Every structure is written in structure tokens, then in C-alpha cells.
């Protein structure tokens, strides 16, 4: 299986020296599974784009220091690609900024939260009705580091993770899209 990693941001300086890039962190995570994956990397910030959603078997969008509302030039084609991947049926995962830009591309609303920053270990409620055949505990504790949030999920999205601080911390969209605010 070939995973396409759409790079929307990266670590810098000492963090990158110590922990690697966002893309390399995800590769290390996937390497811990029993499955063999190959990878294609697209730095969308500099105009690196796949030929089509079919260029990879599944897709992941990384985090970013940029906000969806910054409307940077690369965000419009990324949102178009998100819609195409969603419609193609290929699996798509969004983490942090990836969660936010997927929501925006599919009709949701993303804003800087009036609650400020969410930092540290947060407890999220799992909506059992939304996860269906994907067994999860009633709550998950995941590190958070964000001030932007999906304020309104896309129509048709099923929110499966929520907290008082972040009511839309993860959602399913159709059968092939899943997103997580925390990481």
C-alpha cells in the first residue's frame, strides 16, 4: 500500500534535528505496524501535487503552523484535492491542520478558538454511535497543541471525538475520511 503524505507544515530547528520532520514522524509510526507501506511525499506549500487521487492508495495531511483562514495560495488547490480524494473513495486522514483543512474543504467552519490554546494531555469523549464497528474506549487521552478549531463540522460529518474545550476533535466523513485535531 502506498501512502501519500501531503506536507502542509513542518518542524523547525532543534525540534527537527531531534525528532525529524512531520512526514518522517508519520513514517516511523506506520513502520511500527505489521504492514509494509511505501510512501510518496508532496510538499503542497511549494506546489508539489499528485497527478490524481489515484496516485496513492491512501492519503494523510500533516499539521501546519498556518491557519486555514490564512488563505495562502497553496490552500485552494489542497482543498480541491481533498474534495477529489473524498469523492474517489481513497482513504484520507487529517491530523491537526489536516483535520481543519479537510473540514473547511468539505464545507465546515474553522476559526481561532476564543478559548485560547489547548496544550497538553486532553481527555476526549468517544461517541460510540459514530465509531460503530471500530471499538474504542469511552474516552481517549491525547496530547493537544492548537488554538484553531473546527467550529462547525461539514454537513454529513459524524463527530466521534469531543471535549468541552474542543467539541469537534475528530470526525468521519463518508466511509473514507477520518480526522483528528489532537496528536
Each language-model region and where it sits:
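N-terminal beta1-alpha1 cap of cysteine-dependent amidohydrolase-like domains
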Residues: 1-88
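Hydrophobic/aromatic beta-strand patches that form the interior of the parallel beta-sheet core
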Residues: 4-6, 40-42, 60, 93, ...
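Surface-exposed, flexible loop/turn segments at secondary-structure boundaries
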Residues: 11, 47, 67, 100, ...
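Short, well-ordered secondary-structure micro-motifs
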Residues: 16, 51-52, 105, 153-155
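Catalytic metal-binding/acid-base residues of hydrolase active sites
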Residues: 43, 98, 148
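Cysteine-nucleophile active-site neighborhood
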Residues: 62-130
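Pocket-forming structural segment of enzyme catalytic cores
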Residues: 106-182
Amino acid at each position: 500500500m502506498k501512502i501519500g503524505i501531503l506536507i502542509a507544515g513542518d518542524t523547525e530547528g532543534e525540534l527537527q534535528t531531534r525528532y525529524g520532520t512531520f512526514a518522517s514522524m508519520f513514517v516511523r509510526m506506520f513502520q511500527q505496524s505489521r504492514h509494509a507501506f511505501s510512501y510518496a511525499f508532496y510538499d503542497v506549500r511549494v506546489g508539489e501535487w499528485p497527478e490524481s487521487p489515484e496516485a496513492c492508495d491512501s492519503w494523510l495531511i500533516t499539521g501546519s503552523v498556518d491557519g486555514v483562514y490564512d488563505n495562502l495560495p497553496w490552500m485552494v488547490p489542497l482543498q480541491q484535492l481533498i474534495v477529489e480524494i473524498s469523492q474517489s473513495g481513497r482513504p484520507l486522514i487529517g491530523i491537526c491542520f489536516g483535520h481543519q483543512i479537510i473540514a473547511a474543504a468539505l464545507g465546515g467552519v474553522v476559526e481561532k478558538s476564543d478559548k485560547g490554546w489547548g496544550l497538553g494531555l486532553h481527555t476526549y469523549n468517544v461517541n460510540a454511535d459514530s465509531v460503530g464497528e471500530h471499538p474504542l474506549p469511552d474516552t481517549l487521552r491525547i496530547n493537544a497543541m492548537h488554538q484553531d478549531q473546527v467550529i462547525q463540522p461539514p454537513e454529513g460529518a459524524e463527530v466521534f471525538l469531543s471535549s468541552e474545550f474542543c467539541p469537534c476533535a475528530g470526525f468521519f466523513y463518508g466511509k473514507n475520511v477520518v480526522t483528528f485535531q489532537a496528536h
